[in-house]
Curated annotation (Swiss-Prot):
Keyword Phosphoprotein: no
Enzyme class: transferase
Keywords: Acyltransferase, Cytoplasm, Iron, Metal-binding, Transferase, tRNA processing
Note on how the cofactor is bound: Binds 1 Fe(2+) ion per subunit.
HAMAP family: TsaD (MF_01445)
Cofactor: Fe(2+)
Protein name as it appears in the record: tRNA N6-adenosine threonylcarbamoyltransferase
Gene Ontology MF: a single term: N(6)-L-threonylcarbamoyladenine synthase activity
Source species taxonomy: Bacteria, Pseudomonadati, Campylobacterota, Epsilonproteobacteria, Campylobacterales
Originating species: Sulfurovum sp. (strain NBC37-1)
InterPro entries associated with the record: ATPase_NBD, Gcp-like_dom, KAE1/TsaD, TsaD
Length: 337
C-alpha cells in the first residue's frame, strides 16, 4: 500500500492505494474554496495554515493501514511553496517513523495519471492539461517520457476563468460559476477576440482575452451595474473564445501527431462545454478521447498515489532528508516534464 499526500494549492488530500490491484482503499479531500472565496482567489499563507489543520485530521483516519504501507508519496512540484511544505513535512515524518521509502511526485504527472486511477496505463497518449496553473498539450510516450508540445505564454485556462469571474463579482472558483451562467447566455452577443488567431505559434495565451473581458465589463458600467443576462452573455462569449483558441491550436497538433488516443485532464477539464468541443474534434481526426472521472479532475491525492505505484515499481525513491520543493523553471515546448 502507498500513502499519498497532495497539498500543492488549496486542496488538502490524502489517499491509500493498493499497489498490486491499484484500488483506492481510502481517499479524502478537504477543499478550502469557502475560505478563499471572499478574496476572489487563493491566499497562499491562509492556504498553508488551513493545510496545517486539515492534513493531520485526515492522516489520523489512515492509521489502520500504517503497518502495511510500502511507501509514502507526496507532491513536491509545481505549486505554492508554503502549501507544498505542509505536505512534504508530513510525508517526511511518516517515511521516517514507518521506515518506508519516500516518492516525490510531479503534480502535472499526477494529473495525467488521474486517467489511470484504479486502471492500467494507456500509452502513447496526447494530453491537454488545463488547470488553474497550466495550459499544455503533452505527448506522453510512456512513464519516463512526457514532452510538452505547447504551453501557455501567460494566464492558464483555469486562472483566466477565475479572474474573469472576479471581474464580474461572481465569486470563487470561477470555472463552475462561468460555465453555469454560460448555459443561460448568448455566446454571440459580445465579439471577444480569439487569442493568437492569426499567429503561426502553437502556444496558448489568454491575457488579451482577459483584458477584453475587463473592457467589456467597464463598458457595461462595471460589475455592479451588470444584469444577470449581461453576466450570462459575457460568460458564454468568453467561454466560446477560450474554446475556439484551444481548438485552433489543438488542430495543428492533431494534424501532425499520429497518436490515436487523446485525453483532457486538470481541474478545468471538468467543463462540459469544453469536453463536448473536444469530443467533436476527436471524431473529426478519428482519435479516441479519454477523460478522468469528474471527482478526480481537480487536485487530489488519489492521482498522486496512482503515479506513485508506477514510480514504486521502478524504485524511484528519495531519502526523506533530501526531499524539498523543486523550483520549476518556466516550461516551454520541447521540454520534458
Amino acid at each position: 500500500m502507498i500513502l499519498s499526500i497532495e497539498s500543492s494549492c488549496d486542496d488538502s488530500s490524502i489517499a491509500v492505494t493498493e499497489t498490486s490491484t491499484k484500488k483506492i482503499l481510502y481517499h479524502k479531500k478537504i477543499s478550502q474554496e469557502a475560505e478563499h472565496s471572499c478574496y476572489g482567489g487563493v491566499v497562499p499563507e491562509l492556504a498553508s495554515r488551513l493545510h496545517a489543520v486539515a492534513l493531520p485530521k485526515i492522516l489520523e483516519e489512515t492509521k489502520p493501514w500504517f503497518d502495511k504501507l510500502k511507501a509514502v508519496a507526496v507532491t513536491n512540484q509545481p505549486g505554492l511553496g508554503v502549501t507544498l511544505l505542509e505536505g512534504i513535512a508530513m510525508a517526511k515524518t511518516v517515511a521516517v517513523l514507518q521506515n518506508i521509502p519516500l516518492i516525490p511526485v510531479h503534480h502535472l504527472k499526477g494529473h495525467i495519471y488521474s486517467l489511470f486511477i484504479e486502471k492500467k496505463t494507456l500509452f502513447p497518449l496526447l494530453v491537454l492539461l488545463i488547470s488553474g496553473g497550466h495550459t499544455q498539450i503533452i505527448r506522453v510516450k510512456d512513464f519516463e517520457h512526457m514532452e510538452i508540445l505547447a504551453t501557455s505564454m501567460d494566464d492558464s485556462v483555469g486562472e483566466s476563468f477565475d479572474k474573469c469571474a472576479k471581474m464580474m463579482h461572481l465569486g470563487y472558483p470561477g470555472g463552475p460559476l462561468i460555465e453555469a451562467l454560460a448555459l443561460k447566455g448568448d455566446e454571440n452577443r459580445f465579439d471577444l477576440p480569439v487569442p493568437l488567431r492569426n499567429s503561426p505559434l502553437i502556444a496558448f495565451s489568454l491575457s488579451g482575452l482577459k483584458n477584453a473581458v475587463r473592457l467589456t465589463v467597464e463598458k457595461l458600467g462595471g460589475a455592479e451595474k451588470m444584469t444577470e443576462q449581461d453576466e450570462a452573455d459575457l460568460s458564454a462569449s468568453f467561454q466560446k473564445a477560450v474554446k475556439l483558441h484551444l481548438l485552433q491550436k489543438s488542430k495543428k497538433i492533431f494534424a501532425k501527431e499520429p497518436i490515436r488516443d487523446f485525453a483532457i485532464v486538470g481541474g478545468a477539464s471538468a467543463n462540459q462545454y469544453l469536453r463536448g468541443a473536444y469530443a467533436d474534434l476527436c471524431r473529426e481526426f478519428r482519435k479516441t478521447m479519454h477523460v478522468a472521472p469528474l471527482q478526480y479532475c481537480s487536485d487530489n491525492a488519489a492521482m498522486i498515489g496512482r503515479y506513485a505505484i508506477d514510480a514504486y515499481e521502478r524504485e524511484q525513491f528519495i531519502d526523506p532528508n533530501e526531499i524539498d520543493i523543486v523550483s520549476t523553471k518556466k516550461q516551454q515546448a520541447g521540454m520534458l516534464l
